[in-house]
């Protein structure tokens, strides 16, 4: 087709493929064990995998959840509550709880914004100002989307915007 032959096309104009907006890249992270089963169901609906970040207390309180996450092919990471005085020690305790339960540890950690990175972990940081799914989907830069409630609505927003949704892993190219 020549542009002038398309309905609404202007003679002599062409669309620059480089000018077309690329789909957003969004790395998915899930927190809050109370909503993780709903998040798993939403991910399954969209045929996606996610990274789920648990505290030591969440691992100890709901060990069945850890097994369900792993059985569904999701990645387990660790997190600490906001205001944790010693994030590195809290991560070590959570990793020990995980290892006692499933005989494996993780290097993946999601820490509060401004926390110091814990040695020996691949640390990602929750955004200081949380990003919504709509903001992440409209962005041209990669975003970390931390979901703790209503994952289905967030995933729908990403899906309808053709965003590229990726599981946050130790090897993720997100800074």
Describe each PLM feature range.
Residues 2-97:
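Active-site beta->alpha N-cap acidic-glycine motif
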Residues 81-175:
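Catalytic domains of cell-wall/extracellular-matrix polysaccharide-remodeling enzymes
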């Amino acid at each position: 087709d020549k542009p002038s032959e398309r309905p609404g096309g202007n003679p002599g104009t062409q669309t620059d493929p480089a000018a077309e907006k690329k789909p957003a890249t969004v790395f998915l992270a899930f927190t809050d064990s109370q909503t993780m089963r709903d998040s798993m169901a939403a991910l399954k609906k969209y045929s996606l995998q996610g990274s789920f970040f648990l505290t030591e207390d969440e691992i100890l309180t709901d060990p069945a959840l850890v097994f369900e996450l792993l059985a569904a092919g999701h990645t387990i990471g660790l997190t600490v509550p906001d205001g944790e005085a010693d994030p590195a020690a809290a991560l070590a305790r959570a990793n020990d709880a995980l290892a006692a339960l499933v005989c494996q540890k993780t290097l993946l950690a999601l820490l509060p914004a401004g926390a110091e990175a814990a040695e020996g972990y691949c640390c990602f940081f929750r955004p200081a100002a949380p990003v919504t799914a709509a903001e992440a989907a409209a962005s041209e830069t990669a975003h970390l989307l931390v979901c703790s409630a209503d994952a289905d609505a967030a995933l729908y927003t990403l899906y309808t915007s053709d965003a590229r949704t990726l599981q946050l892993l130790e090897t993720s190219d997100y800074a």
